[in-house]
Amino acid sequence: GMYALCYYYMAPSPERDQTITSQAIIAITEFISRYPESEHINEYKEMLDELSGRLMEKSYLNAYTYYKIGRYKSAIVAFKNSMKQYPETPRKEEIMYYTTVSAYRLATNSVESKQMDRYLATLDYYYSFIGEYPESKHKRELDNIADNCRDYIDKNRKTEQ
């Protein structure tokens, strides 16, 4: 128990290194499976939830940092990984929103040979987002992005033959 607690109190906040947090999760999980009858079991389960939340937040912040500095390709990969790793994240709407915007910005900043595919990819993200969050506060902005994508696709499709 003390061993697990030490790790818990050493665990850093989300924006710092997460190795200790991962070790704490392992230690607490082992404690829970070894001593399921412990009188402290609920406290340990709460700690586990909190530590998992920290890792989830860290994963989101990493992806968001790529977005903020304009590394849109890396942002898309990081946001997708975050969703895969933490499907229960409370930030799902934000992640899907930033993925769509990142895809759009990547498309607009791409060399011409890559633009068509990237505008099409942006539309895919857009439809996923709108399917999941039809009433989102981001809807109008993303509708505009989708219109721009469609305009590009319509203008350039004919010339590709």
Q: Can you name each region flagged by the protein language model?
A:
Residues 1-161:
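Acidic, polar-rich low-complexity tracts and alpha-helical solenoid repeat scaffolds
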